[in-house]
């Protein structure tokens, strides 16, 4: 039996969170951090770690000439929600977003980080290629970000 990966939905390809207004919020950004949300311990047992994902996403950004700076206030955040069945395929939802500091108009003492650009994808994957399929999906999302970033910040 051949392992197979099913791409159920790629919201990034539909343009959700990657429209012209979303891309405009990336204009003028000079550097960014890379943050990986806490992962399900089962994903870590399978070999998918925050460090592996962080280095993978940061590497894609660096290869595209985007400065990765751990001290930057702006950051690219990757979130993975998962359901790992004991038998059968795993279900993964990956979301990559760009977060920037924002102030509330009505109360400028309130500061927070908010996503201003985002793409997502959902996978169903057999257990054997789980790590590689997850890395490939993270690469695709990072590449979508690079494309969006470069569309408003040409080299």
Model-predicted segments: where are they?
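A structural "domain/chain start" motif
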Residues: 7, 12-55, 147-155
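C-terminal/domain-edge helix-coil "capping" segments
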Residues: 17-24, 103-155
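Sec-dependent signal peptide recognition
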Residues: 1-7
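Surface-exposed short loop/turn segments
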Residues: 64-67, 72-132
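N-terminal, post-signal-peptide region of Sec/Tat-exported proteins
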Residues: 46-75
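Arginine residue identity/basic-tract feature
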Residues: 2, 23, 38, 54-56, ...
């Amino acid at each position: 039996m051949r392992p197979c990966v099913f791409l159920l939905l790629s919201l990034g390809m539909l343009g959700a969170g990657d429209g012209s207004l979303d891309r405009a919020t990336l204009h003028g950004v000079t550097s960014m951090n890379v943050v990986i949300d806490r992962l399900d311990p089962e994903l870590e047992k399978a070999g998918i770690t925050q460090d592996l994902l962080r280095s993978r996403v940061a590497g894609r950004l660096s290869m595209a000439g985007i400065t990765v700076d751990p001290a930057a206030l702006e950051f690219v955040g990757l979130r993975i929600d998962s359901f790992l069945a004991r038998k059968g395929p795993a279900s993964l939802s990956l979301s990559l977003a760009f977060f920037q500091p924002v102030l509330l108009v009505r109360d400028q003492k309130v500061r927070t980080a908010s996503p201003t650009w985002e793409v997502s994808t959902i996978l169903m994957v057999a257990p054997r290629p789980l790590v590689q399929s997850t890395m490939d999906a993270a690469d695709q999302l990072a590449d979508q970000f690079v494309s969006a970033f470069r569309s408003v910040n040409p080299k």
